[in-house]
């Protein structure tokens, strides 16, 4: 007879078909990332991409994990792969810009944020990130205007978060 824990673990075991699904490995990577297991998340995203190399969210999310580990060249490569598949992918554009900004490449970062905003003018996170890049470039008035737009898009909550 199974204990409740053994029974639960059997129910949670993925089927063979799930194990062959890129979507399964993407979700596994997301779960691992959300639980702070970055290295394991990267492995899961790699597995997903081995099954389906066109899975944009796996490229983007892997890039985010790599950026959080300060592995910036690898992160940029992931965002580039996502953008090869969908050049106007707003999250990949903004995330690429954030990595460039972390490397103090503010002019390049600004171009990414502008492209993300061109893809979705209501993307508050890109406006916020653009404001930071503009400020770093010494363009204070433009930075204030971008920040005001970000705050307006966030619904007047008074604070914006990177997205």
Placement of each model-derived feature along the sequence:
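Terminal, low-structured helical/coil segments at or just beyond the last alpha-helical repeat
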Residues: 2-22, 132, 136-163
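Structural signature of tandem alpha-helical TPR/SEL1-like repeats
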Residues: 5, 34-47, 68-81, 88, ...
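Alpha-helical segment of the N-proximal tetratricopeptide repeat
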Residues: 18-51, 57, 68
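Helix-start (N-cap) detector for alpha-helical repeat units in TPR-like alpha-solenoids
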Residues: 22-23, 56-57, 90-91, 124-125, ...
